[in-house]
């Protein structure tokens, strides 16, 4: 069994059994637990679910859209057959002053790469998407809003802080795509991938996702081993990565589980 299936499903079960039944801004009630944490050694295993199919290529495209393209254009994603931001697209075809727009405005990727190469013991290395003056000019506040970076013994470690974690849909995407980001940055800075810690402040399951999570829990004992992540070893510039340079090898998984997104 993959370590991610084990940790993810344990928290899913805990939320279903012990979560607080709560209202929220979407109007769809949730079962929620605060302060859930998962940690992975990326040298040993790539974290992705096998107890259901995760659209890895879509997750990679979104990741590159945010951090490489530094874009807020939903139409750019649509041109790649990615529709996960359609519900939040504004009249101008963007998501306003959020995600990639914030990365670009504050030159956050270039500053991080420079620090990783030239001052790896810096304790101030982070990417912060929670920029208060720009929150209200976007249709959705960033969910995954902070990454903190550390280099120890030649290994790149990352902590991802997520204010709100949709356990059925968002969290599996976010864990895998930010684990990819660690690998990409490690490769272009001459480091090895190390620890990846995913902290979710509000971990929740929407009531219309309960049956889907219960179905997934029945597959726990039939989970597969984690796949291997392949990254094109020829790429040394972060901005040269394309989705074709990032692949999973031997990704065995169960069938998809349809769940509704709450807007």
From Swiss-Prot:
Its main location: cytoplasm. GO terms for molecular function: thymidylate synthase activity. Its EC number is 2.1.1.45. It is an enzyme of class 2 (transferase). GO terms for biological process: dTMP biosynthetic process; dTTP biosynthetic process; methylation. It comes from the Bacteria. Pathway: Pyrimidine metabolism; dTTP biosynthesis. It is found in: Cytoplasm. One of its GO terms (cellular component) is cytosol. DUMP binds at residues 25, 123-124, 163-166, 174, 204-206. NCBIfam families: PRK01827.1-1, thym_sym. HAMAP family: Thymidy_synth_bact. PANTHER family: THYMIDYLATE SYNTHASE 1. This is Thymidylate synthase.
